[in-house]
């Protein structure tokens, strides 16, 4: 079964750089709305892992999952305090979050089944189509379309957008 890993920082550090939204209440509302979206998207089920690295209480999200859940969409939660300094940037913290999630939920992750990492506040409107049409036996599935200056041709930029990325 496919796994959706929804990453979150509900209450970001006051010194976190480059945040467009820092209010925990607003962020929590967006995380809740996105979680409900993934719980109610039509089609076959998937396992949802919701992982927050700001040690924020997840009662609101647990309640949303209980009220909108399906038997074929189990949801598992983890909230912990990140040890990565905010000054190191969002990317470094997110990599640590992914590592923590994969380690913590290792028993729930079927071997060689894809994990779709999604920024937890975002609703990927075509997630069902992406999951249903993913290439067989892929290792990494990422979006390079909307990232400017990718590759050696343009100054060696090898960045990709990691709001949605899948891996096995």
Where are these regions (language model features)?
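ER/Golgi luminal nucleotide-sugar-dependent glycosyltransferases, focusing on the catalytic module
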Residues: 1-168
């Amino acid at each position: 079964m496919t796994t959706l890993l929804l990453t979150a920082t509900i209450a970001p550090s006051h010194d976190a750089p480059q945040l467009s939204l820092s209010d925990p209440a607003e962020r929590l509302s967006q995380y809740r709305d996105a979680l409900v979206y993934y719980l109610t998207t039509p089609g076959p089920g998937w396992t949802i892992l919701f992982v927050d690295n700001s040690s924020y209480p997840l009662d609101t999200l647990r309640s949303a999952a209980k009220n909108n859940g399906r038997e074929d969409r189990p949801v598992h939660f983890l909230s912990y305090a990140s040890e990565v300094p905010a000054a190191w940037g969002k990317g470094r913290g997110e990599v640590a979050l992914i590592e923590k999630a994969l380690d913590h939920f290792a028993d729930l992750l079927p071997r060689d089944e894809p994990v779709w990492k999604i920024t937890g506040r975002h609703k990927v409107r075509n997630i069902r189509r992406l999951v249903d049409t993913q290439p067989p036996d892929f290792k990494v599935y990422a979006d390079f379309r909307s990232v400017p200056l990718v590759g050696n041709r343009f100054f060696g930029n090898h960045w990709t957008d990691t709001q949605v990325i899948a891996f096995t």
